[in-house]
């Protein structure tokens, strides 16, 4: 009996050793196929899985741009106050980049004369400029918008003018082919800031922008003032969308003489400005003078869809005209 007990103990010891060896052969690692470090040979997950970051770095920007600056789509940008691209400065914005306007300081991008912005988005990866608030909480006028000042002619005596509001955005010169950069496949949403009564920053404000500048495939939505406004200049624009703005869809004055083709403007029944909202508002200048060059731009293939979807829809009493053409303008539609 004593000999038999020793044999049992020996067998138990051998089985135990075999179990230990088998267990130690099971490879541990990350077994989640969606992880960055997935190990297809691992049998047991050891909790080491790594995943792509869901947090995009937010960079605050303000002040002046005087050199070449690149914004990339792996980051997001918060514009605070007036961000000015000064003479000689260049801002390049990669397709797919998201830019937020600060609501407290009413962030606004201003391209000064001699500065350049290259916001070159694509249909698949548009550049989005919008309110910093969370979706569902955003409101018209949360931030300023985009302002471009060029060196093309206008009809202001002396040739140089400051954009309304007095925020130091001067425009005008003698170069019809002036180039302020590229605005392509860009969304400008929830912009427009009142500076003084009847003086606002629009979603996209263009002061004497030259024909060397590319502006196409631009959407301005939910703006507090005009969607697009041209103060003089010669820039040609294509594929513009104005959606549910408060004031005018397209405001044209101070001798703008470029060409605009393919535009769509859609109104909301209850969104109209106290000053009166129009599809087009066109003047030669604010005084109705005969200063030259006359406001003589050509608009082609434009669709204006008004606020009254059917006769039973109640609309704001502040709506005025599809096209308010007045005071010595020579616009062609």
Feature locations, PLM:
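Outer/extracellular conduits and scaffolds centered on Gram-negative outer-membrane beta-barrels
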Residues: 9-14, 325
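Beta-strand/loop edge motif enriched in small/polar residues
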Residues: 26, 52-333
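Intrinsic disorder/low-complexity segments
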Residues: 4, 13-15, 21, 274, ...
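Bacterial Sec-dependent N-terminal signal peptides
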Residues: 2-5, 16-57
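Calcium-binding acidic motifs and repeat modules
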Residues: 5-6, 10, 137
């Amino acid at each position: 009996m004593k000999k038999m007990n020793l044999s049992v103990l020996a067998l138990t010891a051998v089985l135990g050793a075999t179990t230990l060896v088998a267990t130690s052969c099971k490879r541990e690692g990350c077994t989640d196929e969606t992880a960055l470090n997935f190990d297809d040979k691992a049998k047991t997950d050891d909790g080491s899985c790594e995943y792509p970051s869901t947090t995009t770095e937010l960079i605050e920007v303000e002040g002046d741009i005087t050199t070449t600056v690149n914004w990339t789509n792996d980051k997001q940008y918060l514009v605070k106050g007036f961000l000015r691209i000064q003479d000689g400065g260049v801002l390049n914005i990669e397709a797919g980049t998201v830019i937020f306007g600060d609501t407290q300081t009413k962030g606004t991008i201003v391209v000064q004369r001699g500065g350049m912005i290259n916001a070159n988005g694509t249909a698949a990866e548009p550049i989005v400029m919008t309110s910093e608030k969370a979706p569902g909480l955003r409101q018209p006028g949360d931030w300023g918008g985009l302002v471009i000042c060029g060196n093309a002619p206008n009809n202001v005596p002396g040739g140089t003018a400051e954009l309304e509001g007095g925020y130091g955005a001067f425009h005008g010169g003698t170069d019809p082919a002036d180039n302020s950069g590229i605005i392509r496949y860009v969304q400008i949403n929830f912009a427009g800031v009142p500076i003084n009564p009847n003086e606002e920053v629009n979603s996209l404000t263009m002061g004497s922008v030259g024909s060397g500048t590319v502006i196409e495939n631009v959407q301005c939505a939910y703006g507090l003032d005009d969607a697009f406004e041209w103060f003089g200049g010669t820039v040609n624009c294509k594929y513009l969308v104005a959606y549910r703005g408060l004031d005018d869809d397209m405001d044209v004055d101070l001798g703008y003489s470029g060409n605009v083709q393919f535009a769509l403007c859609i109104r909301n029944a209850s969104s109209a400005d106290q000053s009166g909202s129009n599809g087009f508002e066109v003047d030669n200048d604010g005084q109705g003078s005969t200063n030259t060059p006359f406001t003589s731009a050509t608009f082609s293939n434009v669709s204006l869809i008004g606020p009254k979807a059917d006769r039973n829809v109640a609309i704001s009493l502040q709506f005025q005209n599809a096209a308010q053409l007045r005071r010595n303008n020579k616009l062609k539609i």
